[in-house]
């Protein structure tokens, strides 16, 4: 099957395969067996056999008999000998040789009549090398483990982007890069956990369904609990519950889990995404930035063997060294050619925004500064950079800067020009936190869908005493983007599509 195969072609092939399935079932019932075996006498894997015999000479025998299974991805039948390439889930392949001498006429004809591309097949036989030097299994016994009713795509032709996303299983079957991305993601998450463990962090889990959405500025997904007869939200962030854990004495915690935001989807955004958040008692935004750099660099090392990663298009990107720390206001002033400070008024900022075509809904000082910074400065960022010291009115959970009035101790980490992570010196004063929540509620009343709600339960926890801490959040999908150079839909195994 090619990516553009017609529905009539597919229907015809499926009809033929259904007939073969019917025969399999009939033959199995006659023999008193199941057509789809529950288990198989597998003794090895394709990868293990290839590793054991990497340089077997042509036309050689080994005397080793193995039983293994794989998906048929190539097949060629001749009079007395049939060849099939079996592929394992890791992409490794081995040739199966089904010969008249070894299996007999009836079994050989049955192979020719029943086995199709895409079928899972078990074979047992001696490991040999063919006359052309191809590592092979000289089959003595075989069995169809599972019948494919749909034909495989052409392994030598690219799937369309749409097919790759909607039918990721076909992408995994046909493309090594897809399989490598899944492995890279697993390696990355394992590396993150190992780095946290080396710093005595404890992994915890917090609620996905919440009665009040908070911890980030974003629109939530809303649902309803029949059992409790109440409105619930899919979480936009785990922050407020993780901080409760810190109040309870869990001084270093992290969570890797799903977040949901009812917003746009593009090359760097997905409504459902994997998020890492961590909180470190007695730290600040400097110490948590150091930890974030270590997390990213360790993950790059685990995946690529180096801090210099190679992207899917062959580009090399250096995640090593010490990353720059760039003040937001100073960098904006330099790029815009106009001094912008925490004391700049909204009309002044609106005038600057209008002069360059930047539109901001519900203008506030912080929203204008951040949008202007994205217009003037963000396009020039490529190397990993911590953008430091944000406006106070867009960061309600962050403590005031220790020496600069009107800003908070917050950074955003940019890699390849997109935001990878964010970090704070966390606000721990419950009185100021209540004032910030009240201001957020006012913004919500003015139509800001992303404003946080006042969370009395969280404030009650804070009132029991919250230690000073640094906190950070990082998208796992975006971390894979930084390491692999792929878009976000490629880093998510099964992304949401229309």
Walk through the language-model features, giving the residues of each.
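Class II aminoacyl-tRNA synthetase catalytic cores and aaRS-like
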Residues: 1-498
